[in-house]
From Swiss-Prot:
Entry GO terms, CC: extracellular region
Protein task: Inhibits contact coagulation pathway activation in the host by sequestering anionic polymers, such as dextran sulfate and heparin, and thus blocking interaction of protein components of the pathway with negatively charged surfaces. Inhibits dextran sulfate-mediated autoactivation of host coagulation factor XII (F12). Inhibits dextran sulfate-mediated activation of host factor XI (F11) by activated F12. Inhibits polyphosphate-induced plasma extravasation at the injection site in mouse model, probably via inhibition of bradykinin generation in host skin.
Subcellular location: Secreted
Protein name: Salivary protein 15b
Family to which the UniProt record says this protein belongs: Belongs to the PBP/GOBP family.
Tissue: Female salivary gland.
Signal peptide positions (record): 1-20
GO biological process annotation, one example: suppression of blood coagulation in another organism
Name of the coding gene: K03
InterPro entries for the chain: PBP_GOBP_sf
Organism lineage: Eukaryota, Metazoa, Ecdysozoa, Arthropoda, Hexapoda
S-S pairs: C27-C44, C40-C108, C91-C117
Length: 142
């Protein structure tokens, strides 16, 4: 009887963690019925990761979070931190400028364009990048 409360609390936490979804699962489920908004899956995931904010902005906190994940998961060596942040900052500026002059302001395409810009940098290997993002996705429960 002494351990009944502890057992119940443990069961509740176990059930909660078993039902948790990753950002990938949550975002794919959210947009699977809407073909026009499938481009937003990427933005949705990046928002959960903290790489882009809800208003499609990419500022210092988002760049810091993204660069830390890439370094933590071995995509970019820590000795190239300054170079990586410069690439990310330049990409963010470029994407914002293109969005202002194009027919779209900041929208779901913004995060896709930003992702592509960062990925085409010589600092980043696409295979390691994708694996790092997938591994990071598994560490987050929503």
């Amino acid at each position: 009887m002494k351990y009944l409360g502890l057992a119940l609390i443990s069961a509740v936490f176990l059930i909660g963690t078993c039902q948790a979804e990753t950002p990938s699962q949550k975002c794919e489920e959210k947009y699977k019925e809407n073909a026009e908004r499938k481009a937003c899956i990427h933005h949705c995931k990046y928002q959960y990761y903290g790489f882009i904010d809800v208003n499609y902005n990419i500022a210092q906190p988002e760049i810091r979070k993204f660069s830390n994940v890439l370094m933590d998961y071995g995509v970019v060596d820590r000795s190239k931190k300054r170079e990586l942040k410069k690439v990310m900052h330049d990409c963010a500026k470029k994407i914002k400028k293109e969005a202002r002059t194009g027919d779209h302001w900041l929208n779901c395409r913004t995060s896709i364009d930003y992702y592509r810009c960062v990925l085409t940098s010589k600092l980043i290997g696409p295979q390691r990048f994708d694996k790092a993002i997938q591994d990071y996705d598994k560490t987050i429960s929503v």
